[in-house]
Amino acid sequence: MGASWHQTIRALGSAHHVEVDGSQRHRMCQNEFVEVLNRGKPSVEQIIRIGMDTSKSVFQLHGVNAVEQPILRKKLSRREMVKFFEKTPPTIIALEACGGSHHWARLLSSFGHEVKLIAPQLAKPYVKRGKNDAADAEALCEAMSRPTMRFVPMKTADQQAALMLVGMRERLIRNRTQLANAIRGFAMEFGIVAAKGMCRIEALLERIAADPSLPELAQDLFALHGQEYRELACQIKTLDEKLMKLHRADECSKRLAEIPGVGPIGASLLLMKTPDPRMFKSGRDFAAWIGLTPKDHSTAGKVRLGVITRAGDEMLRSILVVGATSLLQQVRTGRSRHASAWLMGLLQRKRPKLVAVALANKLARIAWKLMTSGESYRQAEGQAQTS
């Protein structure tokens, strides 16, 4: 070994109060170097990376030093964890992107730490054996060290409030749909049917209320269903107004709403649910993040593409596909100005549902371009606005 290696050994031995004579220095290998480094009492100053498994009240920590040796294994309560990181020198902390993780990321960042959020499915392969808090914390610590690891962007409190609005609206719409189906099902038991569409429910309830052949108990129960349906509709309207208020206050959302098939609601959801669009290298990467690109089953040099991956946010993907389907219906009936040669050619070769997904992919790419460039949507010369 060279002189510089021996000098390092002597310095480490002196720093850790370990006596190393000449014969030992000559026999010392890299493993012994690690052993010397870790003799003595480990301190938080040696920690370069911490993985933390979070829960409601118990937090498991796993920290390593510069030579990847575990020097911290602790289980702390909520209060103890906060105090620990307040006193710990700035380091890198890995958290699983789950409930409450964005709150902890903001808090720990305020203490000077660099926080990385890792998706659960990306941390899972690093769990060696069994499922417990210590193994999860170690897996997070190991996963964070990978140079190609992908991380979840930390959300601000305002972003989470906006997503709460979106989630609440989605839940109310789902409840209204379930209630409408229940009303239709119960009405059919008494021989009363209605045409498709949410707009037909009020007329159905009026017919039921005016039908003298129904038992009094059934009339009362249908009245309760009707009251609940109207309350849900009122709550959804209130949330839509809040969503539109946020849309009108944001210039980027206004630009996105100009894209055919997107609209104000779709633009607001795109802006709220999308992290920093500059994270994506291209519009294709953004569409892949939403789950609008085909699965790759290629092998032996043969390219085989299947159905779309359906990765990413389901609601965001649904909004784009529904918007594309609506735009496609207008094109097929001749009521749209956006019938490009590309779109008409695709309609001749492929099924309408497949074309709608392809169009949704193109809408996602256009949205990414507007979000990253700051430009307004404009129609190209001689082309449709969606081409």
From Swiss-Prot:
Using the chain's own numbering, where are the disulfide bonds? none
Q: Which GO terms describe its biological process?
A: DNA transposition
The record's GO molecular-function terms, alphabetically, read:
DNA binding; transposase activity
- What keywords were assigned to this record? DNA recombination, DNA-binding, Plasmid, Transposable element, Transposition
The Swiss-Prot or TrEMBL record describes its family as follows: Belongs to the transposase 20 family.
What is the name of the protein in this document? Putative transposase y4pF/y4sB
The opening ranks of the lineage are:
Bacteria, Pseudomonadati, Pseudomonadota, Alphaproteobacteria, Hyphomicrobiales
